[in-house]
Amino acid sequence: MKIINELQLAKELIRFPTVTPIDAGIMKFLEKKLKKLGFKTKILEFKEKGNAPVKNLYARLGKKSPNFCYAGHLDVVPAGNLSDWTINPFKPSIKNGHLIGRGANDMKSSIAAFVSAISVFVEKNRGFNGSISLLITGDEEGVAINGTKKVVDYLKKKREKIDFCLVGEPTNPNKLGEMIKIGRRGSMNGRLTITGVQGHVAYPCLLYTS
């Protein structure tokens, strides 16, 4: 079995212009990689009225518990004005030891790291106890209604249980890759009123034109 190089895979993923909700063939591409590692895969497409259809991928290796799931998304925010980039955002480049391209940080490199780590683990631990799965969505950067929630609902109907889940979003505000956080440590309810113009850092063009 061939070990998958995480940098090479990250570059390949960045080349897909997967601006939410565009798939551009990336789920099929990743599915093919996972099948070679022995995964059983399913591309799940969901659509809600008024929104474009979204493709997601669920893949699992093994049938036993516990099921350890890697979760993430392959869609990216718009690249904006291409003249503001020093490179084509969908043609990855290495500069000063950093991988540059749309989605390099959020979060195609994480997906590549998942798959690379799995390829190493499977090579060294054939016949391991338990299962490994990946839940990869395509609308995290958008309205996020046809991704994780609907995939989880689908899995519940199939009585597919995820025991543990690792989300590869960057978490350390100071140095990349040096922190693991618990996703939810509690909750708080309240009411907050904010006045002004609504906007989002990923979509400044909408703010300026509103």
Place the predicted regions along the sequence by residue.
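A short, acidic/glycine-rich surface segment
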Residues: V77-A79, P173-M179, V201
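Glycine/serine-rich anion-binding loops at beta->alpha junctions
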Residues: H98-A113, H200
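Conserved small/polar residues in nucleotide/adenosyl-binding loops
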Residues: Y208-T209
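Acidic/histidine-rich catalytic neighborhood of metal-dependent amide-processing enzymes
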Residues: M107-G183
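Acidic/His- and Gly-rich active-site-bordering loop/insert found
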Residues: K2-I100, E123-F128
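Solvent-exposed residues in well-ordered beta-strands and their adjoining turns
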Residues: G62, T193-V197
